[in-house]
């Protein structure tokens, strides 16, 4: 029989390998078992007036603002309706393009891609706020940490809240018609206190909050799901390791689900 110590080592190794910043054993087990199922919540389809068996597809483009090429491709896809919605990283150098595009296309579904990590090798950024106001979120180069574990380990909750609110405020001040928030790399979905803060920010700003079904393990009798938290029954994203030439096949292969 597997020992408790060995089980803990296996669990810790699993989360470390997958860069999942979960340090509470009970919560870790919930994530592993995926103990919260879509049946626990009224489906998004039902909320929109469809039957629970109807399948709705949302094709979402995040990381707007990352690079001019990302912007131009995403803008074209949004205008052609091949992409349903998109969200903007407000800590990058190309957000003016997004603001201009939003002004010309005010009915588009655009959100703020709340960002607290900087994982790219050639694209690095810090926060919207001054470095002195968010020291716990920054490395020695005054940039966000490159992975979610370090962010979760070192971040101060007040500084996180202030930075995320500043990102929303900046988007609104630039004329972006913000409809929702989501989380870059899912960094805000693991720590219970940070996750609650994420949902509270959505409520405070009268925005919808994207929640993948995996993150709904946080909800229980002491923390019921708020109405503005929109749970997606299934969530698919091409992960690292999938070659560019294989992207089309990846998405076509999930189309039958």
Q: What are the residue ranges of the model-derived segments?
A:
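C-terminal active-site subregion of NodB/CE4 polysaccharide deacetylases
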Residues: 43-59, 66, 129-130, 134, ...
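Active-site beta->alpha N-cap acidic-glycine motif
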Residues: 44-121
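Active-site beta-loop-alpha junctions enriched in small/polar residues
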Residues: 64, 91, 113-119, 184-186, ...
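Substrate-binding cleft of extracellular glycoside hydrolase catalytic domains
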Residues: 107-164
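Acidic (Asp/Glu)-rich catalytic clusters
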Residues: 49, 74-80, 96-109, 126-139, ...
């Amino acid at each position: 029989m597997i020992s408790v110590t060995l089980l803990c080592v296996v669990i810790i190794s699993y989360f470390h390998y997958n860069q999942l910043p979960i340090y509470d054993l009970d919560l870790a087990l919930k994530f592993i078992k995926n103990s919260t199922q879509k049946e626990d919540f009224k489906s998004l389809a039902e909320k929109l007036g469809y039957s629970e068996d109807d399948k709705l597809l949302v094709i979402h483009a995040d990381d707007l603002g990352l690079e001019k090429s990302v912007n131009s491709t995403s803008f074209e896809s949004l205008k052609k309706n091949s992409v349903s919605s998109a969200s903007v990283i407000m800590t990058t150098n190309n957000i003016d393009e997004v603001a201009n595009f939003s002004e010309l296309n005010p009915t588009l579904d655009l959100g703020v891609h709340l960002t607290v990590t900087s994982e790219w090798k050639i694209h690095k950024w810090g926060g919207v706020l001054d470095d002195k106001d968010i020291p716990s979120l920054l490395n020695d180069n005054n940039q966000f940490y490159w992975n979610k574990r370090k962010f979760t380990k070192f971040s101060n909750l007040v500084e996180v809240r202030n930075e995320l609110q500043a990102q929303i405020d900046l988007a609104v001040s630039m004329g972006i018609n913000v409809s929702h928030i989501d989380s870059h790399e899912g960094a805000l979905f693991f720590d219970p206190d940070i996750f609650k803060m994420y949902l509270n920010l959505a409520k405070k700003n009268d925005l919808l909050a994207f929640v993948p079904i995996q993150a709904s393990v946080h909800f229980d009798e002491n923390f019921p799901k708020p109405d503005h938290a929109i749970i997606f029954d299934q969530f698919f994203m091409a992960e690292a390791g999938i070659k560019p030439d294989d992207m089309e096949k990846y998405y076509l292969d999930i189309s039958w689900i």
